[in-house]
């Protein structure tokens, strides 16, 4: 997260956009304190984005720099501030169907307002390059049960949309 002068500059930018553009503002600044969230909210930011990435069980296989609980605590602070929470994850990172289900349930339990679902696009030279692209039916099944478990959330298709046809 930004701190000090950088955070103050971000606050100024959000205040300016809120005042002059009259648009909904969403911040995505990583781990953040309750005080910083409050300042963002006062500056006109109404939503905060912070993906949980995957299930609690699969998280250590994907990320070693921080914990799943740190992600959850950040999202709880967002909700406590009265802001809209935007959080989702990436499918196709070697997780099981149960992991996807657990991620959908975790997001429902947190009352997440907007859920971006990203489908991994394996890129040569990256740690997950060996994984196969997801099939269109797998992506659609995942979206379907995310919708069922999170009926009020805005489900957003993000990375991997190119894997879907127009059929």
Task: Identify the function of each model-found stretch.
Residues 2-5, 65, 91-96, 123, ...:
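Short, small-residue-enriched loops and turns at beta-alpha junctions
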Residues 69-127, 138-158:
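Conserved C-terminal portion of the radical SAM core fold
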Residues 24-28, 154-159:
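Short catalytic-loop micro-motif centered on adjacent basic/acidic residues
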Residues 54, 121, 161:
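Flexible, active-site-proximal loop/turn residues at the rims of small-molecule/cofactor binding pockets
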Residues 32-42, 92-108, 162-167:
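Catalytic cores of alpha/beta
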Residues 1-78, 83-88, 113-118:
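Core AdoMet radical
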Residues 8-9, 31-32, 69, 98, ...:
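Residue-level recognition of alpha-helix initiation/capping sites
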Residues 27-32, 128-134:
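Short, exposed beta-strand "edge-strand" segments with a Pro/Gly-rich flavor and a Y/T-containing core
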């Amino acid at each position: 997260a930004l701190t000090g002068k950088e955070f103050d500059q971000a606050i100024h930018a959000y205040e300016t956009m809120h005042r002059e553009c009259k648009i909904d503002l969403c911040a995505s600044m990583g781990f953040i304190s309750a005080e910083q969230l409050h300042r963002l909210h006062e500056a006109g930011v109404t939503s905060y984005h912070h993906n949980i990435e995957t299930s609690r069980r699969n998280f250590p296989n994907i990320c070693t720099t921080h914990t799943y609980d740190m992600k959850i605590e950040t999202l709880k602070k967002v909700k406590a501030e009265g802001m809209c929470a935007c959080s989702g994850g990436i499918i196709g990172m070697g997780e099981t169907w149960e992991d996807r289900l657990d991620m959908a349930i975790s997001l429902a339990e947190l009352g997440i307002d907007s859920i971006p679902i990203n489908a991994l696009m394996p890129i040569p030279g990256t740690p997950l390059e060996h994984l196969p692209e997801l099939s269109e039916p797998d992506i659609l099944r995942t979206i379907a049960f995310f919708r069922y478990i999170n009926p009020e959330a805005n489900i957003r298709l993000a990375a991997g949309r190119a894997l879907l046809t127009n059929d």
